[in-house]
Amino acid sequence: MKMNKKIVSMLVALFLTISALSAVSGDGSDPLDPSDGGADWDGDGLTNAEEQNHGTNMNNADSDGDGLPDGWEVNNGLSPTNGGDANGDPDGDGLTNAQEYAAGTNPNNADTDGDGKNDNVDQYPTDPND
């Protein structure tokens, strides 16, 4: 009878342990766990898991300190770990990436709104009807 109580106690403990482990939510607290990297602690547009993949800091929206959020850099083909990206001009429109970010324009398209005027001379570079 004592052996049965021990077995039952061990099974209950095992059940409680397994239940606790399966209750962990995907809150982004473990960026190395592919099923638990969905949070974006620093609000830069990259999930914690993506931060891990890009080698950026999940607690710093601008890991390289260039004034451009990591997510914006990644989404525009720039490097979130290269502080020199802010001064680049990949589309050749005369605006730096930092200026493109501030204006809300596309650093890879000289005419973001498609109105025939390059962003650097367009008074409303995001309004195709200007």
Predicted regions and their residues:
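Secretory targeting signatures
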Residues: 1-28
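Extracellular calcium-associated, cysteine-rich motifs in secreted modular proteins
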Residues: 24-130
